[in-house]
Amino acid sequence: MKTIFYVIIFASSLIANIRDNAEKYINSAYGKDVQVHFIKWLPNEERKIYLEKKSRLRFMFDHIYVWEITRSDTLIGIAILDNVLGKSLPITFLSCFNSDGKLIRAHIVKYREDYGYEVGNKRWLNQFIGFGINSDFTIGKNIDGISGATISVNSVARGINRSAIIVEYLLTKKDAGSY
C-alpha cells in the first residue's frame, strides 16, 4: 500500500513539473504581459475519433492540456500540451498557436527515449512555424526527416498536425461561445 502511495506522489510531482515547464515556455512564447487560462480538455468520443482519423494518430490519454492566452481580454493564442508515442515511450510536446491557428512555436517538454532526441532541436522544430490546419505535414516534402529518428519525427509531426486541428476546432467553438 505504501508503494502505491509513493508511486502516486511521484507521478503527481512529474506531471506538475511538466505543466510548470510548459507554462514557463508559454510565457516566453507570448510575453509576460499575458493572462494564461488552463483547461484540461476531454474531447467527447465522437470528437476523439474524428481527431484520430484526421491526424492519423491515436491519443495516448483521454485528455490534453490547453491554455488560452489573452492580452487585455483579447484571445491572442492557444497552447496545447500533448503526448505522442515515440519508439516505445511518450514524447511530451507543446504547440503554441496564434489566434489565426498558425503555429508560432513548438517545444519538446519531455523526451524519454535513448535515441531520436534530435526532434527537440529548436532548428528542426522551427520548420513548423506558420503551419496550420491546411498545411502539408508530409515528411520529406515540407518537413525534414532526421536520420535515426524516423519514428519520433513522424510522431511529433503528426502530433503538431493534430494540435493544429484541435486549435481550429477550439477557435471555432470559442467563436460560438463554448468548447
Spans of features found by a protein language model:
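Flexible, solvent-exposed loop/hinge segments and secondary-structure transition points
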Residues: 17-143, 150, 154, 158-179
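Sec-dependent N-terminal signal peptides
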Residues: 3-13
